[in-house]
């Protein structure tokens, strides 16, 4: 005896589960193709033996690494959290590993993370938002990797897009506020393509319906509570006080409301406020925050469905999947 324990093998798992090594291998690569009762026995045997699959060997032997790269701008105070949490839970349960990378608002950093994911031969790259760099889009199309763009709905996706129209969301908010009688909107816009698309479409729709051009200010990303407070103070620089402030995130809206109330302003009686994202705190604020809701968990479910369909060698019925959005009318506007 040399004192070094022998690592459990795939054969050990097969013997304990009462199946062939080929069945265990099939379960590890595609658990959905193994009968449920057999899969349960194999799972129990893996736990009992402490067996760890050799993922590198599996990658070399087949075409799947079972590694998924998820690239998101940020996760702190993020509207993407529901999507990320549901995605990781579902992918992990299916035997995949998730490589989570933060890209921030820097396009150079995004491209770097995409290249890193490609070099690791991932099975899929999940992007938050739409890649605008044409060279990067061409590189992704040239690789045999599934690419899912989420939280956006480009006309010509790289591979698959799951999201909603930011243009439509901006237009709908403009129509909603006009119908509620507001006349002087002010936009607080995070510096991101998604926020800019919503703000631009809001302004266009507002003026089409006979309103004046909205005033606006820009803030850096990621958006946070403090930006909302600063946004309220910046109203002093405007030629007139707006009657409604359209914030690019619920965090900005929350900070704006807190600062407005500290200054003695009544929300929404003297100034109304809307957010975006329908974060949990939006319904806990006083006043509660009118916001735009996107079902992040549904984005994740559609993502898993797409990956399962493609991994099974089946054809998708559609490559642009619209999960929609809805305005949640609350007390702040």
Where are these regions (language model features)?
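Flexible loop/turn connectors
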Residues: 238-333
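Hinge/beta->alpha junction and helix N-cap segments in small-molecule ligand-binding domains
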Residues: 55, 73-82, 101-109, 161-172, ...
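Amphipathic helical "hinge" segments at domain boundaries
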Residues: 51-116, 120-124, 203
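Periplasmic-binding protein-like
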Residues: 121-129, 186-189, 218, 239-249, ...
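N-terminal helix-turn-helix DNA-binding module of bacterial transcription factors
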Residues: 1-65
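Short acidic capping loops at alpha-helix termini that bridge into adjacent secondary structure
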Residues: 184, 213-216, 266-273
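Flexible loop/hinge segments that line or gate small-molecule binding clefts
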Residues: 128-172, 251, 277-289
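Append "Primarily bacterial transcriptional regulators
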Residues: 13-14, 46, 192, 271, ...
């Amino acid at each position: 005896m040399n004192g070094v324990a022998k690592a459990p093998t795939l054969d050990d798992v097969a013997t304990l589960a009462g199946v062939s090594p080929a069945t265990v291998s099939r379960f590890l690569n595609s658990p959905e193709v193994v009968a449920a009762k057999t899969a349960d026995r194999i799972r129990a045997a893996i736990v009992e033996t402490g067996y760890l699959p050799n993922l590198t060997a599996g990658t070399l032997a087949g075409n799947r690494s079972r590694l998924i790269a998820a690239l998101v701008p940020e996760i702190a105070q993020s509207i993407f959290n529901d999507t990320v949490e549901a995605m990781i839970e579902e992918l992990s349960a299916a035997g995949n590993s998730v490589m989570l990378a933060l890209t921030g608002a820097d396009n150079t950093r995004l491209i770097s993370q995409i290249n890193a994911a490609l070099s690791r031969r991932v099975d899929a790259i999940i992007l938050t938002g739409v890649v605008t760099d044409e060279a990067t889009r061409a590189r992704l199309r040239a690789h045999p990797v599934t690419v899912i763009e989420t939280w956006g709905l480009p006309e010509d996706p790289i591979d698959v897009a799951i999201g909603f129209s930011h243009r439509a969301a901006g237009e709908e908010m403009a129509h909603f506020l006009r119908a509620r009688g507001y006349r002087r909107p002010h936009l607080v816009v995070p510096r991101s393509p998604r926020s800019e698309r919503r703000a631009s479409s809001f302004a266009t729709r507002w003026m089409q319906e006979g309103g004046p051009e909205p005033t606006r200010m820009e803030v850096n990303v990621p958006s946070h509570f403090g930006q909302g407070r600063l946004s309220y103070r910046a109203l002093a620089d405007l030629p007139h006080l707006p009657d409604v402030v359209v914030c690019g995130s619920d965090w900005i809206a929350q900070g704006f409301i807190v600062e407005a109330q500290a200054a003695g302003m009544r929300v929404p009686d003297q100034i109304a406020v809307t957010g975006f994202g329908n974060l949990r705190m939006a319904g806990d604020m006083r006043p509660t925050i009118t916001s735009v809701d996107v079902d992040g968990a549904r984005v994740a479910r559609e993502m898993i469905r797409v990956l399962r369909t493609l991994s099974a060698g089946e054809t998708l019925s559609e490559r642009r999947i619209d999960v929609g959005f809805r305005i949640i009318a609350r007390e702040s506007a």
